Regions:
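RNA pseudouridine synthases
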Residues: 1-223
């Protein structure tokens, strides 16, 4: 686990592809528990440690995760997420270059709970939710393209689904049309940067994620 920012109210850590943020049916140790144990050891606390999950990343996604260290910070950060006051920027490596180097995508997404998958439509349909993101090309190699993605809405698998719908699936994302998986089982989607006004101190917090260690990320992401 890599800690990238910490104060008395919150902690921001790097999640590797394959890790889960919260406990689920898999029985794997979640990142939240790893962070709790790290805090407990660091501050030599004999009892339980409070840690609030503010948001999640899909298991195959890597990058920044914010946790609250107090109940007050958790409430405020939850409200900030709800009001769009925490700005998250993603980097995605896609297997085909998009038709336009920069664009805003608007789709209507329907979530299929049984399949754990979302489907995109170009018009409103029953149970669909309007989904908007903006992307721009920031680097390319012979075979892959690196996009910077900003979400205007927060839907289930939104980036994965909308990019796939433009015939630009994320590298390794078999569920959304990538031709093959990544060796580590993850997908090439990185929660790269978060920026927000601190819920208590009111200072501007800006944190960037390190790049995943694989060779493609190191080659295409060092810009």
């Amino acid at each position: 686990m890599q800690v990238l920012y910490e104060d008395n109210h919150l902690i921001i850590v790097y999640k590797e592809a394959g890790e889960i943020v919260q406990a689920d049916k898999s029985g794997d140790i979640p990142l939240s528990e790893i962070v709790k144990q790290w805090l407990k050891a660091k501050y030599k606390r004999p009892g339980s440690v409070f840690l609030g999950v503010v948001h999640r990343l899909d298991r195959p996604v890597s990058g920044l995760v914010i946790f609250a260290k107090t109940s007050k910070a958790l409430t405020r950060l939850n409200n900030m997420f709800r009001n769009g006051e925490i700005h998250k920027t993603y980097w995605a490596i896609v297997t085909r270059p998009p038709f336009e180097p920069e664009a805003t995508l608007t789709d209507w997404l329907v979530r299929n709970e049984r399949q754990n998958k979302s489907y995109a439509y170009n018009h409103q349909v029953p149970t669909s939710k309007k989904s908007i993101l903006h992307y721009k090309v920031i680097n390319q190699t012979d075979h892959y393209t690196l996009l910077e993605v900003n979400l205007m809405t927060g839907r289930h698998h939104q980036i994965r689904c909308q990019l796939s719908n433009t015939d630009c699936p994320i590298k390794g994302d078999l569920k959304y049309g990538a031709p093959r998986s990544n060796p580590d089982g993850g997908i090439s989607l990185l929660s790269h940067r978060v920026e927000f006004v601190h819920p208590v101190s009111k200072e501007t917090i800006r944190v960037e994620s390190p790049l995943p260690k694989d060779n493609l990320w190191q080659a295409i992401g060092n810009i």
